[in-house]
């Protein structure tokens, strides 16, 4: 059986595993590498120094590895790296990285990216995330594991969203969202704990209670932020589910939502 449609345009320098399926009118550039059992629908365009792993499913009209929307970009050989087992739906756009950033845009494994989502240059997305339709990341955004972005979520450049966090429909994320927390609103504010997401991913009632106490410490007890952070970091030394806060606070540059 022919796995590549005869109307697809694939540069002879591109490296595709023999099991890759390519739909009609798809265009694949010379510096693209695609791993085993990845399926690409019709009318997709994959350019740039783009590496795509195994068992991905890329739907029609996706645009992957196009140059970043950055006026400083001067055709440097920056990268887009996509892991394994991702679903990338219609009209998604993933841009290359920039030399003024980390030089690459990275997406991990088992992510579910719905239609019309956008990942700008130098974004880093972890594993097992869900991006609902039209969620968009500006440049240099970091998304942790098991994050859920509601439809039309917009994330400002350089923001971080921690593991297991969740945003509501049309959230405008202008500061960092701590792990496990929910954010909502045009200028996103804390909206409670993603306790249902934690339960679905195997957290115990005791672990959820410990994280809930962190939320209360940050937002409901009137404690100055630096004192609250120090208290959380002390608890993180003995409570494994709180360890993610240590790295999150250390890497946060924009401050957290309040």
From Swiss-Prot:
One of its GO terms (cellular component) is membrane. Its main location: cytoplasm. It holds the Pfam family Acetyltransf_11. It is found in: Cytoplasm. One of its GO terms (biological process) is lipid A biosynthetic process. It catalyses: a (3R)-hydroxyacyl-[ACP] + UDP-N-acetyl-alpha-D-glucosamine = a UDP-3-O-[(3R)-3-hydroxyacyl]-N-acetyl-alpha-D-glucosamine + holo-[ACP]. It comes from the Bacteria. Its EC number is 2.3.1.129. Keywords: Acyltransferase, Cytoplasm, Lipid A biosynthesis, Lipid biosynthesis, Lipid metabolism, Repeat, Transferase. InterPro entries: Acetyltransf_C, Acetyltransf_C_sf, Hexapep, Lipid_A_LpxA, Trimer_LpxA-like_sf. GO terms for molecular function: acyl-[acyl-carrier-protein]-UDP-N-acetylglucosamine O-acyltransferase activity. Pathway: Glycolipid biosynthesis; lipid IV(A) biosynthesis; lipid IV(A) from (3R)-3-hydroxytetradecanoyl-[acyl-carrier-protein] and UDP-N-acetyl-alpha-D-glucosamine: step 1/6. HAMAP family: LpxA (MF_00387). Homotrimer. Belongs to the transferase hexapeptide repeat family. LpxA subfamily. Involved in the biosynthesis of lipid A, a phosphorylated glycolipid that anchors the lipopolysaccharide to the outer membrane of the cell. This is Acyl-[acyl-carrier-protein]--UDP-N-acetylglucosamine O-acyltransferase. It comes from Neisseria meningitidis serogroup A / serotype 4A (strain DSM 15465 / Z2491).
